[in-house]
From Swiss-Prot, chain A:
Comment field on protein domains: Histidine-containing phosphotransfer domain (HPt) contains an active histidine that mediates the phosphotransfer.
Domain of life according to the entry: Eukaryota
Gene3D superfamilies, per database record: HPT domain
CDD domains (UniProt xref): HPT
Gene, per the UniProt record: AHP3
Protein's UniProt name: Histidine-containing phosphotransfer protein 3
Record domain HPt: where: 40-147
Tissue specificity note: Strongly expressed in roots. Detected also in flowers, leaves, siliques and stems.
Induction / repression: By salt, cold and drought stress.
Swiss-Prot record, chain B:
Keyword Ribosomal protein: no
Transmembrane intervals: 82-102, 447-467
Record carries keyword Transmembrane helix: yes
UniProt name for this protein: Histidine kinase 1
Gene transcribed to yield this protein: AHK1
Compositionally skewed regions (Basic and acidic residues) per UniProt: 975-984
GO molecular function: histidine phosphotransfer kinase activity; osmosensor activity; phosphorelay sensor kinase activity
Record's compositionally biased regions (Low complexity): 1000-1014
GO biological process terms held by the UniProt record: abscisic acid-activated signaling pathway; response to osmotic stress; response to water deprivation; seed maturation; stomatal complex patterning
Domain Response regulatory stretches: 1045-1196
Organism: Arabidopsis thaliana (Mouse-ear cress)
Amino acid sequence: MDTLIAQLQRRFCDFTISLYHQGFLDDQFTELKKLQDECSPDFVAEVVTLFFEDCEKLISNMARALDQTGNVDFKLVGSSVHQLKGSSSSVGAKRVKGLCVTLKECCDSQNYEGCVRCLQQVDIEYKTLKAKLQDLFNLEQQIVQAGGRIPQVDI
Amino acid sequence: MRGDSFSMSIENLPDSPMGSRKKKMQIRKVFDKMTEWVTPWRSNLESPREMMILRGDVEQDEFQYASSHCLSSYYSVFVVRLAIMVMLAILIGLLTVLTWHFTRIYTKQSLQTLAYGLRYELLQRPVLRMWSVLNTTSELTTAQVKLSEYVIKKYDKPTTQEELVEMYQAMKDVTWALFASAKALNAITINYRNGFVQAFHRDPASSSTFYIFSDLKNYSISGTGPEDVSGWNNKSIHGNMSAIWYQQQLDPVTGENLGKPLKIPPDDLINIAGISQVPDGEASWHVTVSKYMDSPLLSAALPVFDASNKSIVAVVGVTTALYSVGQLMRDLVEVHGGHIYLTSQEGYLLATSTDGPLLKNTSNGPQLMKATDSEEWVIKSGAQWLEKTYGSKRPHVVHAENVKLGDQRYYIDSFYLNLKRLPIVGVVIIPRKFIMGKVDERAFKTLIILISASVCIFFIGCVCILILTNGVSKEMKLRAELIRQLDARRRAEASSNYKSQFLANMSHELRTPMAAVIGLLDILISDDCLSNEQYATVTQIRKCSTALLRLLNNILDLSKVESGKLVLEEAEFDLGRELEGLVDMFSVQCINHNVETVLDLSDDMPALVRGDSARLVQIFANLISNSIKFTTTGHIILRGWCENINSLHDEMSVSVDRRKPWAPMKTKQVQHRNHLQKSCKNANKMVLWFEVDDTGCGIDPSKWDSVFESFEQADPSTTRTHGGTGLGLCIVRNLVNKMGGEIKVVQKNGLGTLMRLYLILSTPDTVDQNIQPDFSKYGLVVMLSMYGSTARMITSKWLRKHGIATVEASDWNELTQIIRDLLETGSRDNSFDSQHNISDPLRAELSNIVEIKNPVFVIVVDIGVLDLTTNIWKEQLNYLDRFSNKAKFAWLLKHDTSNTVKTELRRKGHVMMVNKPLYKAKMIQILEAVIKNRKRGLCNDLRNRGNGSDESHDCLEIDPTQFDTCSSDDSSETSGEKQVDKSVKPSTLHSPVLKNYLIDATTSNDDSTSASMTQKNPEEEDWKDRLYSGIALDGKNQKSLEGIRILLAEDTPVLQRVATIMLEKMGATVTAVWDGQQAVDSLNYKSINAQAPTEEHKSFEEETANKVTTRETSLRNSSPYDLILMDCQMPKMDGYEATKAIRRAEIGTELHIPIVALTAHAMSSDEAKCLEVGMDAYLTKPIDRKLMVSTILSLTKPSAFQTSLSA
């Protein structure tokens, strides 16, 4: 049992580190984790879920706005992406944030092609992140179920 | 070939100006194209820069496009050059051909015409002669015939011999008359029917004349009838052997007989025309030969008819030599050259222009020769050519040019003359050389000359074209170069722009992690369980981090200033204090370098000015650190003085004269000032002048301007030796300009650099800022014993100016001497007179001091004056201690002065210790302390000495200015870095001014002092926390927001959640709303406002003072939140709008709820916008916990915060 936990814990550590290394997450996520304690045990998961909901909403908003060929409301896209940038930076979704910055630039320069391209990337990126985080949480749960402690990962 | 060129020339000749114009047009076109390639690009250049940035990729394409254009235009120059050359070649070729052609053709044609005439003439004349010869002959013959007829008619039918003889005699006379009259005649013969022949003959060889007749005896008188005509023949003459011929010589003139008739053989007879020659009774012509003549003879024969005109009675023959024709030809040819000959139709030569024989001797005597057999080669070949060319069907007229006979060319002309019964052909053969020789030669020469000339011209032309187009190609090259340069420049600009943009965008991202690193390090440092080694390492890391942060800040500042986003603060600050702190800080560094740092501020400098203190300090920090870098020995002086803007005009004229190099700047300043005066007359603007003067290596005058450019260093090698990025001075200049001033390197006497700058700062309205304490009345005597001469001089000057007697000493010996002189006056009254090593001015000074009644001696001793290397210093101290009751000692310590020295000093009761450098404010502190001390009396003094050993003084030794937070626990360098660090940080809080530089010993004696000091420590700690808000927030601050009610307006759910949790963790009560509208609503100001007036009405009767307080309290209580965190971008109502609405609602109330902006942008412009709409502070996303806490705390508990600090 202990070996299983240790294995799980090691996997968890590796996975987390890989997430940081691959640039999916940054320190903000660590900050987020620090905020999680006994009073709010599922804080991270909660925030992340919020983030993904937000993401979905904003991305679909932007996609809709960009769909209207001819008179694309770049302002609308801009404000959406601004929000997305804010929330992604708060969660520590580094890649999404970086893409947001690019998308914002495209938006500012009214570069339709760029916007569409970036948006697709954002979509892909956020889905990847979602999957990764899902895995992470699953691992966490497994560890908890096995009776282990979530290890502190130092980046 | 020639025809071609001719036609071409005909076409081109009138065209040629057109052609050149065309060429010009072509060239123009090419140039137009080139300029076209350049111009669109040029117009691009003027396009707004923003567009450039946005269309980076597109522009790159354009660059390539432009450069390819440039290349092709370069080729086109080459092509144009080639084209021009080809054109030139064609032109010159045409010109040459034409010239040659025309000169030749016209000459040739005219000559040919002339030659034709000449030839014609040449031929005509012999022919005419021939003609005339023929005519003469014919006429003579006719005349002879007529005469004969007449005579014969007269002696018609002679019957007798006598009659016959008579008739013959008559005939002879008549004939002679005719013969004699016509000298050209060769012979006249009359052949009678009966066979009798009479003839006259001239022999040109012997030039004698003969009469030839036949024997009459055999002839019958009656003769034969006409029917016998047929019986006549030549045989009867020649063959008639029976006849006897006589020849009688005559006198050629008179015709007298010169001798007897001689018998001659018939072979010697001349031709005698017979009846056979006139078979049809008509005149007939013959060409005959005679053995007496070497030329052919022309003989005509005519019959003589009898009276009845029915029968021929005689035949008259006239023979003429053609000799004269040949003579004429010879004459003609002699003049003109060439050959002429006449032939009969059959081709027998009649006459030639040569001397060659015309007859050939055959066995039958001389015979006529054919022209083709002529001995003259030219005639022979000419005749052969004619025969060969034309054969038998020769046309009447032949003109042949350029007939090649042998190796020469000839003209051959032939005429056919159809004379009566004697057709003649005349041929002229003239060598071409005679007529065209010169022309041909000249044409050849002309051609040669023309060709060589045109080749020369072509080459010269090519060279000219090359030279002329060289300019163009050079220009093209230059243009290409220019394009490249501009291209590069634009790239550079674009990249620089990107850089600025990038940096501006990255500012937050860069600074936050650095702040975090430093903060974490601070936490680590404050941790107790670190080993020494670890501690050292961590400290080192912290140093490095701060250095990195400083560098980052430099770069960011620069980019901010460059992108025009830097906003200067407008806040009051104590200028002197800032600069003193700065000098304190740098002096530490300077002492290490053995360089003296001196601050020399004039007394009229305003104490408080309005401006951006951080930026100001940054300016001087940069300048001084720069100076330190390059100064190894000597001093660095920071001078400052001030000019009032209004009084400046009067001073201007003077100052311009005084400072020549500064003059242009002054005039600029005047303009600037005029402008300023107009715009803000009542604003209390000051012009503050500063100089940073060092004794370093100096800057080359040529680099005085360029050192202020970014990444520019006076000497590139300095990067290696001194490090640095070259950004410092650039930032300085930008900041100075931003503050309305200017900076310049100024000429200075001696080594080093002198930077002079002025700033325009406004001073607060509070009047009388600088009250200078009046020390003169206390009778103070200050003895400055410092070995830094500059600082000493400046300080003493200042002291003297304020009426304080000052004595200077530079080393220990001097000090002891002066002390002895001054303080031991009691025992040795006039001892200083005997001192011989005191200089005169000093002596005068000393004598002045002695006259002061009841003087208070203050001896300022630099610790460096003592010999610290050995233990002598203790003795020196003991020596000085002897005078401690007579004078007050103030010690100037170095930052690295060892604790033993300090302890010793303290033990001895010397408690006035200041850190170097000594400047005005410190001096004032010392003096004030002394004066205060003096008032307390001597007994205190003694007590003070007794307690000197108390360890509680430890904390006093370093002047607790606001800078001690930096310098207290860190090493020298860290303090410097921290200083800069702080100065860069946008500090909304202002440092509470701690006025005491020096804690006086008397106050430190009290118990309360120690208590206050212990109290002070946590305060300082707290202060430090707030100052470096990113730093050190340890566990005890975890719940630092306890009890604070916060309204969070944030639309992003994630952020809202995170912020809420964050704040709640720290003990705050958070209410989250989704947009600005909700935020405004939840504040519910309206109801409060509505409430307030009613309350006011109610309490109208009450006292006004009461009323106000009630309302205030009620308002304060009614406000549901202590603070609002406001996101800037929100749906419905954004943060700015919401803030405006809240502030509007607050108008008329005393309420001011702090609003903190949350924004994802990190530029000062955003900050400015936030502050403009009425927000109090500004935080960037993602939220930094510590920063947020410190900001919230500073806003929510300002009173507590300040009270805790300003104790």
